Amino acid sequence: MTNDPTKSTNPFEILGFTPSFSITPDQVQRAYLQRLTASHPDLSGQSAQTLDPATLNHARDTLLDDEARANLMLEHLGGPSPKDHTLPDGFLMEMMQLRTQIEEELDPSNPDHAQARTQWQTWANAERAQTIQTLTQIFKQLESPNPDSSTDESTDSPEELKQSIRTHLNAHRYTQRLIEQLDPTYDPSSADF
């Protein structure tokens, strides 16, 4: 980690955070506004090294996006790269069945398609929330391991925990695509999966 955020490309460093998956949107927004204010030419002077707004915007957007922040954090911890496409056993078959069911239920010829869309959106949002909660718990184990804790029931090694994060992130991407499929403007003939 560099001490000078103007020389960094890491969103955590740019906004002055110690890398952590658990940072909140409020913390990100506050840090972003502080850096943006400090970088304003009227306040910082022309000679001061400042961060350009595009860099700050990118850092903020990355840290506000759960998946992007998790990938950044996993990279920071030395975990598997996004090129690792490991998925839970049976997951692809389940996704194929869900996609078929969603397409059938959202077909405009189905008289209940509007109600089905709402139900599937609720399901997808719950899946997303569960994934983020799971990732948060695993990252907490990696960020602050406490061998004396009686509440930590995990016996997984740090490498196994990192692989678990990658597997959850890969599954999360599929769920995100299902959420996109629920958009009323979604066109199955132009889908990229």
Where are these regions (language model features)?
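C-terminal accessory/regulatory regions appended to core domains
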Residues: 1-193
